[in-house]
Amino acid sequence: MKITISGPPGSGTTTVAKIVAEKLGLKLISAGDVFRQLAAKKGMTVEEFSQYAEENPEIDRLIDQTQKEMAEKEKNVVVEGRLSGWFVKNADLKVWIFADPEVRYSRIAKREGKDLTVVRQETRLREEFEKRRYWKFYSIDIDNWTIYDLIINSGSFDAEGVVEIILKAVEVKKIKVDQK
């Protein structure tokens, strides 16, 4: 069973992916964790590292290739990241989670203990950089949701509600854990 969970910053993908992986007994691969770890190693904020990555395509390619290879090796996995739905071609279920930008900014501000105005500006900038990078490096339009099986507004549900919707989709699609 392979599930991808994607969405913009603050939409809840990391939280939801962790819970889904735990409930289904699957391994979790998170691009965001890798990206944040690399930013910290360089002594940069996520926004600074996003700008750095725009000028250094090897960063994105390293993260994306690593995530893709890890997902291909695993039979039972939840892959979380903005591009995971695009890179994990053989996923059984591809999920896109979104929320109103103000809801997302508020979540990020709370999570990171930052001022909402600062988060709003940083997140908009980050999303602009990422959108350009994805198009420039991969010809991916991140706003094209047609590749996803399931699209959920996390502003309308708490994390557990989003998880329940995903678990119901797994049940409806009759997706099973791969025993091989």
UniProtKB/Swiss-Prot annotation:
Keywords annotated in UniProt: ATP-binding, Cytoplasm, Kinase, Nucleotide-binding, Transferase
Cellular compartment(s): Cytoplasm
GO molecular function: ATP binding; CMP kinase activity; dCMP kinase activity
EC supergroup of this enzyme: transferase
Positions with a binding annotation for ATP: 7-15
Any one of the GO CC terms: cytoplasm
Keyword set includes Secreted: no
Family: Belongs to the cytidylate kinase family. Type 2 subfamily.
Source organism per UniProt: Archaeoglobus fulgidus (strain ATCC 49558 / DSM 4304 / JCM 9628 / NBRC 100126 / VC-16)
Protein name: Cytidylate kinase
A Pfam family the protein falls into: Cytidylate_kin2
GO biological process, one term: pyrimidine nucleotide metabolic process
EC id: 2.7.4.25
Record's catalysed reaction(s): CMP + ATP = CDP + ADP; dCMP + ATP = dCDP + ADP
